[in-house]
Amino acid sequence: MAFKTLDDLLAEGVSGRHVLVRSDFNVPLDDEGNITDSGRITASLPTIKALIEGGAKVILSAHLGRPKGEVNPKYSLAPVAEALSEALDQYVALAGDVSGEDAHERANGLNDGDVLLLENVRFDPRETSKDEAERGTFADELVALAADNGAFVSDGFGVVHRAQASVYDVAKRLPAYAGKLVQKEVETLAAVAEKPEHPYVVVLGGAKVSDKLGVIEALAGKADKVIIGGGMCYTLLAAQGYNVQDSLLQEDQIDNCKELLERFGDKIVLPVDLVAATEFDAQAENKVVALDGIPEGWQSLDIGPESVKKFDEVIASSKTVFWNGPMGVFEMEAFSKGTAGVAQSIIDATAKNGSFTVVGGGDSAASVRLLGLDEEGFSHISTGGGASLEFLEGKELPGVKVLEA
């Protein structure tokens, strides 16, 4: 993929220039508005620091949550501005709006090396509009903030699969460059997508099988084995004839799953035991059961210990591993062992086998941090869940494609 990078921009010189950066600051917050996982902020720092050192007037844009196109204080980027100020050891101002009067005044008042964070771009309904002309008017307003010989740096890999104003349309209006994070993500995932070393093992989890049928199909054609756990495995087990009781089940997908198993049954690896509970609750009574042993009215919330062993045997022989999605409800300690076990197997494969191991962002990356696992134990932890999946599936990512123009 041929696109200009931050290094190219720095070589051209950024001193005194406005540089608009699309970052990914979609971080989880607790009820008090405190950031509970700052991984995405940390991942954005190399690009921001390089621009500060180059003397750029840095304007950061990002979204947080789903405010549905209207201003909602719950989704303000104020906690992010505070976290950035601390991480960069310099004040990061938060604009009082996205592209309005306050944003313009602050952007015009920036000195070389200053950083301004715009308020949540999704406070404006045009950001996510399906109408290109509508998005374009918003993109024009964002571009107008970069009045001093402006440039655009795309550094939010978690959003490059979206054709949104601050990701896609802005890149068509300014000289556009891939930031350090986007460059690293694309190069790493391209290595997995184009020339994975075999055996190549894909580990998929998460809630809905309907969201990942296309992914399973695409990756099963390239991988040697596809391990499936998490909520999505119950519809596949039902397709094999098991009664999954009250476990998460998409009945309308059973026929699709049957077809998938017929085509790729030799590659798909499913759990052999489960952890069932009386209800979806951290304190619920629970026990390890066989696939056909879920008590009536109970639901499975994790894979069992024999499944972890079975999956470990497959992962242990790998040379490339891509993992996206937890094996169970990892946020609840009683149902976190499957995810922790599989993650540890991947870490072991990295260390003992020299396997190239990639964690595909989203809940998988969050689980690594929440469970206190060694982040350095993986070859790469992606910041983009949906983006990394779509990339490996072979789909075109609008926010990357536009950089090649």
Curated annotation (Swiss-Prot):
Molecular function GO terms recorded: ADP binding; ATP binding; phosphoglycerate kinase activity
Subunit composition and interactions: Monomer.
Presence of the UniProt keyword Lipid biosynthesis in the record: no
Pathway: Carbohydrate degradation; glycolysis; pyruvate from D-glyceraldehyde 3-phosphate: step 2/5
Cytoplasm is among the record's keywords: yes
Catalyses which reaction(s): (2R)-3-phosphoglycerate + ATP = (2R)-3-phospho-glyceroyl phosphate + ADP
Native source species: Corynebacterium aurimucosum (strain ATCC 700975 / DSM 44827 / CIP 107346 / CN-1) (Corynebacterium nigricans)
Cellular localisation: Cytoplasm
Name under which the protein is recorded: Phosphoglycerate kinase
Keyword list, A-Z: ATP-binding, Cytoplasm, Glycolysis, Kinase, Nucleotide-binding, Transferase
Gene for this chain: pgk
